[in-house]
Amino acid sequence: YGGLGYGGLGYGGLGYGGLGGGCGRGFSGGGLPVATASAAPTGLGVASENRYEGTVGVSGNLPFLGTADVAGEFPTAGIGEIFYGCGNGDVGITREGGLGYGAGYGGGYG
């Protein structure tokens, strides 16, 4: 529209689709950086060449999130499984740092 419309320098100034700031990276699927640190030991390992018969249980508290791994072969006449639980299943972000909202609206809404 003569260089002043939606695709030019903005909508009556420097807004829509032109040089205006705001509503940018926060709404474009950018990353969410997360850094965690554990005060507790970072691993738990149970390793043995022995044969376990019956139920083997390991319990305790792990920080935030954890993993479980089984290596080896299970005999076809028996069963093998991992029952792994972490809290009540709710994982949430309790605090965020950083810049917060975008830079604001463009200067050309008028």
Curated annotation (Swiss-Prot):
Residues 97-110 are annotated as: Right arm (Gly-rich tandem repeats). Residues 1-19 are annotated as: 4 X 5 AA tandem repeats of G-Y-G-G-L. One of its GO terms (cellular component) is egg chorion. Pfam families: Chorion_1. Keywords: Repeat. GO terms for molecular function: structural constituent of egg chorion. GO terms for biological process: chorion-containing eggshell formation. InterPro entries: Chorion. Sequence repeats lie at residues 1-4, 5-9, 10-14, 15-19. Residues 1-27 are annotated as: Left arm. Residues 28-96 are annotated as: Central domain. Belongs to the chorion protein family. This protein is one of many from the eggshell of the silk moth. This is Chorion class B protein M2410. It comes from Bombyx mori.
